[in-house]
Amino acid sequence: MKKKVLSVLLSVAMISTLLVGCGSGGSADSADAPADGGNSDDAVTTASSDGAEEITWMFWDDLNATEDLISIGYKDVVDRFNKDYEGKYHVTPITTNLEEYYTKLNALVASDETPDVFIVSPGPNLDVYVDPGVAADLTDDLKADGWMDTFNGGEGAFSQQTYDGKIYAVPLNIAAACVFYNTEMFEKAGISTMPTDWDGFIDACDKLQSAGYTPLSISAGTAWCLSMLAGYLCDAEGVDLDAIDAGTAHWTDSNVVTAANKMLELSKYFQPTAAGDTNDVATANFYNEEAAMLIQGSWAIAQINGSNPEFEDKCGVFAFPGTNGRVIAKSDSLAMSAKTEHKEAALAFMKYFTDDTAQKYTAEVGGKIPVTKVDYDADKAPAQLAYVMDVFSNASSTFGFYNESLASTEAGSTFDDAMVSIYLGTPVEEGLQTIEDFYVNNVWNK
């Protein structure tokens, strides 16, 4: 059965909201990497020696070693581009891990070696490249040949990538933060109805624990994973980030305290090694059936199915409980260096990520929601994608990662660190005071 993605299930208004809360110009079917900025994935494609125009692209995964299906799809984009433009253009990836990505990208920017194209998350993580003029204005390029018209929602698809009316990045896919669960463990624990509120969630955890299972796998070693959970809890308690930015609400308010205490209440159901486990380890705990649930973005579908294909049949998905239908949504995006000397090559490469081949792969293999109007075969897509689409179709609204939605990247990092610190034993009020102090010194008095 063929489905036109999002145009049936999601309205244009919803797709615009998703990206705020978070045909092609290339083939529809079809540079010198700095020494200290990351690894050059020369094995992805043979480096050009035929005089082709060289560009670089920086990404947060090892394209040669990865089992992540979305990353494997990006590797295919690189290979297709280099093959199709052989003798004219050639792209060399610069790769690192996610935890070190922005540190290494910023080092390249500071040394005036910004990659021609680089992946970025919208929000403050993109602001820091827009404000100093590192990222190029892509507005005219998107409108010039109908590229923008291929996106669901047209210009609305670029809401979170737009600053002062100009577009600085191109979204590649959409994902939602959900609760993944082991259907067999839930059945054996006597859970037949998925929890929709906090009390139901705690009750499910109790039943799983009583049945001998670790209820939740999560990473506090990778701070944003714990922070994502905290963001859901804060939003459920009515924390208003606009009011906090304006100084009319505070990080020490009772609703934030309640959210932090709920995080601690839930933490008794985490795996014993959560404090040191990385995101990859926590995810592996789930797909290796060492825990019953994983609170993670739907980008994890590619990692779960790529690492353990047999687990797909027993992997269910439900919306995080108690949020009144609100869902965390996120999109990976591509930016182009404002100083690139290879603009046409860079744009041609970027268009390959949103052509029909790449976007079909996004849904049919990677399990993420495409951003274009591409038709995809729902029967080929991972089973979990349909569950995520159900979460989106029932969403009342969406919002972004807290660490990407605060006043600055530094504010986001402060929030992340405070949540980890509270989990590790810092008293709630003391931990929240560190965020409050940051805002006093860096946001409200500026």
Question: Could you tell me what each predicted segment is?
Answer:
Residues 7, 23-127, 131-132, 144-147, ...:
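Conserved N-terminal structural module of periplasmic/extracytoplasmic solute-binding proteins
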Residues 38, 97, 121-178, 202, ...:
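Hinge/lid segment of periplasmic solute-binding proteins
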Residues 53, 83-87, 189, 261, ...:
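Extracytoplasmic/periplasmic substrate-recognition and gating elements
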Residues 58-60, 67, 76-77, 228, ...:
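Extracytoplasmic/periplasmic substrate-binding proteins
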Residues 153, 315-318, 363-414, 421:
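Long, aromatic- and glycine/proline-rich binding clefts that accommodate carbohydrate-like moieties
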Residues 163-172, 177, 202-248, 291:
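Extracytoplasmic/periplasmic solute-binding protein
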Residues 187, 395-446:
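Conserved C-terminal helix/tail region of periplasmic/extracytoplasmic solute-binding proteins
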Residues 205-208, 246-275:
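Glycine-centered hinge/linker elements that transmit conformational signals in sensory
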